[in-house]
């Protein structure tokens, strides 16, 4: 077909011939193509038209118009038949015999075959039919076959489809429910881990606070003593070159009193009586903890609070001093008749006695203050521990209530 199409193609427009005209040299061209060539030849000639030459062989022709050329009816008919063949569908060929058209219908096997299949193949003893007769019979058979196929097990198929979709939906719901359980489990586990981490870190912060409350007062006392010492040196530097006797003696007296006070001020102990914070603390020991026992993680039992080794009797002495002061202030009001002048005089005497007593007992008071600070620090740490234990207990109770839906 491709070779035939080349012979039916116009050399000028490269399309199939349309109303082909033949030149005296026997070459064929489309009528419209020749008209275009002749018009161009006339426009390019100023005085007299030049002879028309064949586009293929360049042979001159005496034709002055396309209408004077002969129509090639044979070629025109061939082109028309070629167009019809090209438009019509191609006949299928046999797969077993290359190039042989399937132009016979085997009634026995109900299929198209070629001539070789009918004469020398497996269909030799079968019943054959023409394509037209087979088409008429199969066209009628198609209607009944289509109707029976349309209702073939349709109800059963729809029922099974509905069952499969229902089972699929239930399976997805179960998987979603299980995945939600897994998500909830890990969310609770993460919450427990975060809670336990915050609890242990809170214990560390409490211990840090205890360290600062134990050491900071002593450090501040030493810094105060050093500052007083620097001030005394500054005073000495200021008056050591004074030549006025009175001023020098006055400054010397103040300097001597300052040095006396500094020397009489006791220095705090550098090694405070506290127990170690932790013994053999190692987080690698937590590697063997199971997930179910995560809530049981805790710091070693010998940690968390400074254990003071201060004896109990200084606290007793301090309490006695406090009670004595309360008795001095409030005793006359409670047990004696109230008189403004006598009351003021009595208060003055008591305060004078108490002031002299305190002046003579400076060391005792400083020791009492030291022990009092230790006692308040201990109460503060104890209160923090009680608060932490209470919060943990409340959280456990809340989780127990939520878990078993008691409310």
UniProtKB/Swiss-Prot annotation:
Residues that bind Zn(2+): 94, 97, 117, 123
Segments forming RING-type zinc fingers: 10-58
Main location: endoplasmic reticulum
Pathway entry: Protein modification; protein ubiquitination
InterPro entries the record matches: TRIM/RBCC (IPR050143), Znf-RING_euk (IPR027370), Znf_B-box (IPR000315), Znf_RING (IPR001841), Znf_RING/FYVE/PHD (IPR013083), Znf_RING_CS (IPR017907)
GO molecular function: transcription coactivator activity; ubiquitin-like protein ligase activity; ubiquitin-protein transferase activity; zinc ion binding
Assigned keywords, A-Z: Coiled coil, Endoplasmic reticulum, Immunity, Innate immunity, Membrane, Metal-binding, Transferase, Transmembrane, Transmembrane helix, Ubl conjugation, Ubl conjugation pathway, Zinc, Zinc-finger
PTM remark: Auto-ubiquitinated; requires the RING-type zinc finger. Auto-polyubiquitination leads to proteasomal degradation.
Reactions it catalyzes: S-ubiquitinyl-[E2 ubiquitin-conjugating enzyme]-L-cysteine + [acceptor protein]-L-lysine = [E2 ubiquitin-conjugating enzyme]-L-cysteine + N(6)-ubiquitinyl-[acceptor protein]-L-lysine
Keyword Coiled coil: yes
Membrane-crossing segments per the record: 316-336
Tagged with keyword Iron: no
SMART domains listed in its UniProt record: BBOX, RING
Role noted for this protein: Endoplasmic reticulum (ER) membrane anchored E3 ligase involved in the retrotranslocation and turnover of membrane and secretory proteins from the ER through a set of processes named ER-associated degradation (ERAD). This process acts on misfolded proteins as well as in the regulated degradation of correctly folded proteins. Enhances ionizing radiation-induced p53/TP53 stability and apoptosis via ubiquitinating MDM2 and AKT1 and decreasing AKT1 kinase activity through MDM2 and AKT1 proteasomal degradation. Regulates ER stress-induced autophagy, and may act as a tumor suppressor.
Family note: Belongs to the TRIM/RBCC family.
Domains (record comment): The coiled-coil domain is required for the induction of autophagy during endoplasmic reticulum (ER) stress. The RING-type zinc finger is required for auto-polyubiquitination.
Protein name as annotated: E3 ubiquitin-protein ligase TRIM13
Organism of provenance: Mus musculus (Mouse)
